[in-house]
């Protein structure tokens, strides 16, 4: 099968990018011919498909590209005609690439599937968040993004968001896309609440490349007396709340990741000996730290979809203490078993609540988890092979 993967970035920038790179590797391992379509960023990985990548946008292009013609259209059509894909698998494409490519792929005759990494289909600003709170106003009134100036760039950015949402509305996109693949029930429910037909959706949880994991052994049971945060260091990720809680406890917290809050937090907690900021790290660097941690904390203050960090942590046998928001609780079992796991693999707490977070950190440290069972269950549940066979059902 010939499969064309599309994402605006072709480097390890965020969860959507990591997902697509892992998917490319997985599909090639199964003998499929894979092409990629992305923006031409200097950070991109080397690829023979680079000649088809549209150039990065000027500010003027940012206002016109989401609506149709231009380099995206010409280069994508060239790639369709040269590669002749059976399937076009979309990821994070809005604004820079635009949903235009869904229309072009459909008209070409390819099967079109779209993995949803955020709530952009129902919220022009991607997050369904306004002033730190969940917002559904755009579900029924797309002008709300202009009224509240929700997009970067204030009014001009909001106008672009509004016009893009009007042009590529749910009726149009459902006509051009065969399957939307939300990784969480939360994402499915959000899109349906925003007016999409549930018949067009199939929940397909993210996966992990098990070949990059260490073998299960007695070492999986060996944990050290610290806990970890892994991800972007910004407000919506809840890192400020986590540091407030951690400063009042005597357990060591290791923060792995970069972001706009990092300089401020490093300065604020420079005299707090049990909070350590590692900055950005690659998998090979942070994997041993994550594997030996007593837990990974995900203190999100916005509705995360299907966080890869949860899947990575559990696959290493590390329990997750996650905020009870978005799709996070779907991945955590606090007792017994459920659709999420066959063994207890973490706890949840009230998002943004420092006192509840402190309490749950202490309870998670005190709990007797079976780390090896957590890893075994997660590897079986999130393995790339299990994912591949489910995905093929939607490619046919």
List the predicted regions and their residue ranges:
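A charged, aromatic-enriched C-terminal amphipathic alpha-helix characteristic of glycosyltransferases
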Residues: 366-395
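Acidic donor-binding loop of glycosyltransferase active sites
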Residues: 291-305, 318
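Conserved donor-binding/catalytic core segment of Leloir-type glycosyltransferases
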Residues: 181, 221-237, 243-250, 254
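Nucleotide-activated donor-binding/catalytic signature segment of Leloir-type glycosyltransferases, i.e.
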Residues: 264-288
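N-terminal subdomain of nucleotide-sugar transferases
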Residues: 1-42, 81-83, 108-111, 247
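Conserved acidic donor-binding segment of nucleotide-sugar-dependent glycosyltransferases
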Residues: 333-354, 362-368
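Carbohydrate-associated surface elements
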Residues: 186, 207
């Amino acid at each position: 099968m010939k499969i064309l993967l599309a994402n605006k970035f072709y480097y390890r920038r965020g969860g959507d990018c990591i997902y697509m790179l892992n998917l490319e590797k997985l599909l090639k391992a199964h003998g499929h011919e894979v092409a990629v379509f992305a923006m031409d960023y200097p950070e991109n990985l080397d690829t023979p498909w680079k000649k088809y990548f549209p150039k990065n946008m000027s500010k003027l292009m940012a206002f016109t590209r989401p609506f149709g013609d231009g380099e995206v259209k010409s280069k994508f059509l060239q790639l369709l005609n040269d590669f002749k894909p059976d399937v076009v698998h979309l990821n994070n494409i809005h604004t820079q690439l635009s949903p235009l490519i869904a229309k072009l792929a459909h008209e070409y005759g390819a099967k079109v599937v779209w993995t949803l990494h955020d709530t952009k289909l129902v919220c022009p600003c991607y997050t369904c968040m306004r002033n730190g709170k969940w917002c559904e106003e755009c579900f029924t009134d797309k002008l709300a993004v202009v009224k509240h100036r929700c997009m970067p760039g204030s009014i001009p950015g909001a106008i672009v968001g509004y016009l893009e949402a009007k042009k590529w509305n749910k009726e149009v996109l459902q006509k051009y896309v065969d399957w939307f693949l939300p990784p969480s029930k939360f994402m499915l429910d959000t899109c349906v609440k925003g007016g999409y037909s549930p018949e067009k959706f199939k929940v397909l949880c993210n996966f992990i490349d098990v070949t990059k994991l260490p073998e299960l052994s007695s070492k999986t049971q060996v944990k050290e007396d610290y806990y970890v945060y892994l991800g972007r260091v910004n407000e919506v990720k809840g890192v400020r709340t986590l540091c407030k809680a951690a400063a009042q406890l005597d357990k060591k917290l290791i923060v792995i990741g970069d972001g706009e809050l990092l300089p401020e937090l490093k300065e604020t907690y420079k005299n707090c000996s049990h909070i350590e900021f590692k900055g950005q790290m690659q998998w090979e660097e942070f994997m041993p730290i994550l594997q030996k941690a007593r837990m990974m904390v995900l203190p999100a203050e916005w509705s995360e979809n299907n966080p890869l960090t949860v899947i990575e942590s559990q696959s290493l046998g590390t329990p997750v203490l996650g905020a009870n928001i978005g799709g996070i609780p779907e991945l955590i079992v606090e007792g017994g078993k459920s659709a999420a796991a066959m063994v207890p693999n973490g706890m949840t707490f009230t998002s943004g609540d420092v006192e509840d977070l402190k309490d749950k950190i202490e309870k998670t440290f005190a709990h007797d988890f079976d780390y090896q069972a957590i890893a075994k269950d997660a590897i079986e549940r999130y393995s790339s092979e299990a994912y591949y066979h489910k995905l093929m059902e939607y490619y046919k």
